[in-house]
UniProtKB/Swiss-Prot annotation:
Function: Involved in mRNA degradation. Catalyzes the phosphorolysis of single-stranded polyribonucleotides processively in the 3'- to 5'-direction.
An individual GO BP term: mRNA catabolic process
Matching PROSITE patterns: KH_TYPE_1, S1
Name of protein: Polyribonucleotide nucleotidyltransferase
Organism, scientific name: Polynucleobacter necessarius subsp. necessarius (strain STIR1)
Gene behind the chain: pnp
Annotated EC: 2.7.7.8
Molecular function terms, GO-annotated: 3'-5'-RNA exonuclease activity; magnesium ion binding; polyribonucleotide nucleotidyltransferase activity; RNA binding
């Protein structure tokens, strides 16, 4: 007899065996489901408040995806040996889970909801993001919380003309597509992808394929709900105060219609604030007014005005039709001492983007559950509050900034040169200086131009455009290059980036409960039209990559040494390479295969570092004459340094043709002499001759005069020298 009422559902999904279970762990949560996909195990939990907070004006949904290092059999680093703040990867997956879940909560539901997903075990070949999304969806489905799910999800790859369902990491390495699609049984809600310049037809096919394949997971969740689901809350939205809505509408609708004829964002925003104050003042004359309720009603009026105008074929907020891209201006090389820069302005959205080149040691080291890896391309997106004419917090990036940076990075990765063709690490930073919609796509355009300005040999220009949607029953309008207000008042944010040859990144977020294949088809076709227009403007501004790097960018040279010589270059405790770095001002990296990369802004320093490393790793050549200092006197001869780290024995009999009684009579420590290498044995011991060198080059050596006076008579060198 067990105390648990456990329900388990298993199903085959592509190559994976998937198990979902509930009822044993985290029983006090509103809903908890553990999903096991070939030993990648995640636990999704959800808890909701029974009532909304007084004055609550938005839906407070939070999603936290947390990776535990014990899942990979590791102990965390750091002094405290425990997990710290969420990593960038955890933040991105938290957003990935949030986006398809949020539209499925009922309108007017303002209770606080918290979804927490823990990774409990990880199979390095099975990514945890899809299991995490399935677990969160299943936890909501079995709970009592009002939710129009369940949501399914699938990862789609594309190789050899075939779609791949939930490819492993090994399969993903050869795939031309990494696409995640999430949705309900009826429609698609969210798409996130990176592609190798694939056509619109292939991308749409991948979305449809993924939606079809996710039905297996949705059906399994429904089966789990039938067996273990809790009764749904008896929740209904608060009744609308129709008389009050009518009163606000009578006061606000006409002036709001006038305000939305103002084409400039700042002036329009000021007018909207003025109208809001006037409406509040008139309502306050009749008694106390709920400011939140008035704001919500005015938002609905604004949405109705803007949406109806667009659906009726009238001009958009800024006067454009549905297909026109805002005016574009581009400047390259705007910052004098950066490696590459571009100022990309599209309407009232502007990005100042800077590219910086670095060496291998500047690569980002990323430690994830699956192991450690290095990333040579970094893209960081920042949007300070002044970009929208507001005040606010300035500091570490928020979730939105991390997500936008990742999207821009995805768009540019497919056109980057390989490390073999371009050994630099690359960091691109997009500073949004103005924002009125589509700032992430402006970052893509500016990022491509900044890299070209820096001399990065990208394969093609990349542009991005954000599409919007107004949907009312069977009527819809797709909008090219949406404004911030159109994003706010519309039903879709559909971002497409790519080259003239195809799509490199696609991201879609839906605010309604899904869209059809027809709408996606129209959006993709219209996005291509907009993208090609933007690409033409970028090509006018900068037709090709700069052939020379900035004078302030590091130059690099790579060459090979024998792997056995690496220890000699590094030296004891790193002493040799540290001295080289300090004395030449160069950055020096050595790979295990013996590849040495030297980087410096100084050509002289780089040449010196290379010469010294070649000297350290050079092999002594029998019969060659070398010049070097006497490092030690012995009774039977002297040690002479002929190459860095290589000393040879100059026997007393090889100093002079005359009989030498005392070595110190002819040589002193520090004295520079020219010697010939007579022999080298298998143990690396070197036998030198001073008299043989003199015989080849001419000259004599006389006894030293006095204790410290060196009397060396040497003819000009005629033989080889190091």
């Amino acid at each position: 007899m067990t105390m648990f009422k456990k329900a388990v559902k298993s199903f085959q999904w592509g190559t994976y065996q998937v198990t979902m279970e509930t009822g044993e762990i985290a029983r006090q949560a509103g809903g908890a489901v553990i999903v096991n996909v070939d030993d990648t195990v995640v636990m999704g939990t959800v808890v909701a408040s029974k009532s909304a907070k007084p004055g609550q004006s938005f839906f407070p949904l939070t999603v936290d995806y947390l990776e535990k290092t014990y899942a990979a059999g590791k102990i965390p680093g750091g002094f405290f040996r425990r997990e710290g703040r969420p990593s960038e990867g955890e933040t991105l997956i938290s957003r990935l889970i949030d986006r398809p879940l949020r539209p499925l909560f009922p309108e007017g539901f303002l209770n606080e909801v918290q979804v927490v997903v823990h990774v409990l075990s990880i199979n390095p070949d099975v990514p945890s993001d899809i299991p995490a999304l399935i677990a969160a969806s299943a936890a909501l489905a079995v709970s009592s919380i009002p939710f129009a799910g369940p949501v399914g999800a699938a990862r789609v790859g594309y190789a050899n003309g075939q779609y791949l369902l939930n490819p492993t990491r090994t399969e993903q390495a050869t795939s031309e597509l990494d696409l995640i699609v999430a949705g309900t049984q009826a429609a698609v809600l969210m798409v996130e992808s990176e592609a190798n310049q694939l056509s619109e037809e292939v991308m749409l096919g991948a979305v449809v394929y993924g939606h079809d394949q996710m039905q297996t997971a949705i059906n399994a969740i429904n089966d789990l709900v039938c067996e273990a689901g809790k009764p749904e809350w008896d929740w209904t939205a608060a009744p609308k105060d129709e008389p009050f809505i009518a009163k606000v509408t009578a006061l606000a609708e006409a002036p709001l219609r006038e305000a939305y004829q103002i084409r400039q964002k700042g002036a329009r925003s000021d007018k909207l604030k003025e109208i809001s104050k006037e409406v509040m003042a008139k309502l306050s004359e009749e008694g106390d007014v709920d400011a939140v309720a008035v704001s919500d009603i005015m938002f609905e009026i604004e949405a109705k005005i803007v949406r109806s105008q667009i659906l009726n074929g009238e001009p958009r907020i800024d006067g454009r039709d549905t297909r026109t891209v805002r005016p574009i201006e581009i400047r390259n090389g705007v910052l004098p001492r950066t490696h590459g820069s571009a100022l990309f302005t599209r309407g009232e959205t502007q990005a100042l983007v800077v590219a910086t080149l670095g060496t291998a040691r500047d690569e980002q080291i990323i430690d994830v559950l699956e192991g450690e890896y290095r990333d040579r391309f970094m893209f960081h997106y920042n949007m300070p509050p002044f970009a929208t004419g507001e005040t606010g917090r300035v500091g570490s990036p928020k979730r939105r900034e991390i997500g936008h940076g990742r999207l821009a990075k995805r768009a540019l990765i497919p056109v980057l040169p390989s490390a073999e063709d371009f050994a630099y690490s690359i960091r691109v930073v997009s500073e949004i200086t103005e924002s009125n919609g589509s700032s992430s796509m402006a970052s893509v355009c500016g990022g491509c131009l900044a890299m070209m300005d820096a001399g990065v040999p990208v394969k093609a220009h990349v542009a991005g455009v954000a599409m919007g949607l107004i949907l009312d029953g069977n009527r819809f309008a797709v909008l090219t290059d949406i404004l911030g207000d159109e994003d706010h008042l519309g039903d879709m944010d559909f971002k497409v980036a790519g080259t003239a040859n195809g799509i490199t990144a696609l991201q879609m977020d839906i605010k309604v409960q899904g869209i059809t294949k027809e709408i996606m088809q129209v959006a993709l076709a219209q996005a291509k039209e907009g993208r090609l227009h933007i690409l033409s403007k970028m090509q006018e501004a900068m037709g090709s990559v700069r052939t020379e790097l900035s004078a302030h960018a590091p130059r690099m040279v790579s060459f090979k040494i024998h792997p056995d010589k690496i220890r000699e270059v590094i030296g004891k405790g790193g002493a040799t390479i540290q001295a080289l770095t300090k004395e030449t001002g160069c950055s020096i990296d050595i790979k295990d295969d013996g590849t040495v990369t030297i980087a410096s802004t100084s050509a002289e320093g780089m040449a010196e570092a290379k010469a010294r490393i070649e000297g350290i790793t050079a092999e002594a050549e029998v019969g060659k004459i070398y010049e070097g200092p006497v490092v030690k006197l012995l009774e039977f001869g002297a040690l002479v340094n002929i190459l860095p780290g290589k000393d040879g024995l100059l026997h007393i009999s090889e100093i002079s043709n005359e009989r030498v009684k005392e070595v110190k009579d002819y040589l002193a420590e520090g004295q520079v002499v020219r010697v010939k290498l007579l022999a080298a044995d298998e143990r690396g011991r070197l036998r030198l001759s001073l008299k043989a060198a003199m015989a080849d080059e001419g000259g004599t050596i006389a006894p030293l005069a006095g204790a410290a006076e060196v009397a060396t008579e040497a003819a000009p060198a005629t033989g080889e020298s190091a």
